[in-house]
Structure formats: C-alpha cells, structure tokens
Design a protein with these regions (language model features):
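Short arginine-rich
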Residues: 201-210
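Conserved amphipathic alpha-helical segments that form helical-bundle/coiled-coil interaction surfaces
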Residues: 103-163, 173-182, 191-202
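Short linear motifs at protein or domain termini
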Residues: 1-99, 209-215
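Mobile beta-alpha loop/short-helix "lid" or hinge segments that flank ligand
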Residues: 57-62, 153, 169-170
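Short helix-capping/hinge motifs at transmembrane helix termini and TM-loop junctions
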Residues: 98-99, 142, 166-167
C-alpha cells in the first residue's frame, strides 16, 4: 500500500508542476529548486526528484551541470521543430481516424469542442477545447503507438498553445477549426489536414513575437 501511495504522490507533484509550466505560472527558464519545492509542497525531496525526472523526459525541464533543473526555454528553431513534429503526427492521426474511426462519433465530439471553444470564458478554456478537439483524431485513429508518440510532445505543444493564448487575437482562428469540422462532415481528410496546418501556421508569428518580448 505504501508503494501505491508514493506513486500517487509523485503523480500529484508531477501533474501540478507540469500544469504550472505549460500554463506559464512557472516561467520559462525558471530554476526548479528542490529544497524550495519541498518547503512549498510539504513533502520529502524523493517524490519531487522523481516528478522532475518525468518532466525531463518530456523535455519540459532541462538539467544543467552546476545549475540543476530549470524549465525549458524556446527559440524560433524550437517552435518550428515542435510545430513540424506535432503537425506530422496530427495529420497521420486524421488520416487513420477518418479511415478506421467512427465518423458520427468524431463529428459529435468535434462539434462539442468547437462549441466550447466558441463559448470559452477564458483563454485557458479555449486551449483545452483545441487540445480536446485534436485529441478526437488520436482517440479514433486505432494506433496506440501514434497515440504514445503524441503524448511525448504533448507538453511542449500545450505550452505553445498557452503562449498563443496570451497573444492578442488568440481566438481569431475559429474558421480553421470550423473547417476541421466541415472536413470531417464531408469525409475529406485532406481538408482537415489543411485546416490544422493553417491553424498552426497562423499561430506561429504571434508565438515568436511573444517569445521575443519575454526574453
């Protein structure tokens, strides 16, 4: 029982730190001091170190000799690489989902998330709706390895979406998301892929400008 409890504690610490990083509550480049986290969270250093190690595996945290663990920083090259990989995975998921998945279920789920996006009361709610909308294709693609590949980059992609949500006009890509819905309705995977690419490419300039202003 103690082992399960410990694992649960690590999960809780990991989830909290991850959420704080991807929502920018912990700024990029910030140092993660284990002793400070120990005092803040009221736990021993062991589960904190295990949680930080998991964040390192996601590359949300970087470890440097003589410095320790710190939150990642991003530049234009990083943004391009993350977007390229994420888009490749998203488009693969779309094509597989529309070939193997349940079209009616996909359309219903996407319309639900589109409605949540349109009625989001905060940028954070909008980010969650976009994340869930794209996640529909992974859930329906029928390829667990593709799903796991997405998870490996999910944290960094969510960080970029939260940065974009800090920018003016973050909600201005509703036509792209509507085009995703229409592509599913018309059984046109290439239209869906094009809409997702347009959404991602449209967000990049604002993200890069934000990074430049927060150097």
């Amino acid at each position: 029982m103690a082992r399960i409890k410990k694992a649960s504690l690590v999960d809780q610490i990991y989830s909290r730190l991850r959420e704080d990083i991807i929502t920018l509550k912990i700024p990029m480049g910030a140092r993660l001091n284990v002793n400070e986290l120990q005092s803040e969270l009221g736990v021993s250093c062991t589960p904190i170190r295990e949680a930080v190690n998991r964040l390192q595996q996601e590359e949300l945290v970087i470890y440097e000799n003589n410095v320790g663990a710190r939150v990642l920083t991003l530049d234009e090259h990083d943004v391009r690489e993350i977007h390229e990989l994420a888009l490749t995975l998203q488009q693969a998921a779309v094509r597989l989902a529309m070939k193997n998945g349940n079209a009616d279920e996909m359309l219903e789920a996407i319309e639900e998330q589109l409605d949540r996006y349109e009625n989001a009361r905060s940028p954070r709610e909008g980010v969650k709706a976009v994340h869930n909308l794209i996640g529909v294709f992974y859930h329906q693609c029928g390829n667990r390895r593709l799903d796991r590949s997405m998870v490996a980059i999910q944290g960094q992609m969510l960080l970029l979406r939260h940065i974009y949500a800090e920018c003016p006009g973050w909600s201005g890509h509703l036509p792209d998301l509507t085009a995703v819905r229409d592509g599913v309705r018309n059984q046109d995977p290439e239209a869906v892929c094009a809409a997702l690419q347009s959404y991602m490419e449209g967000s990049a300039p604002a993200i890069l400008e934000w990074l430049k202003n927060h150097e």
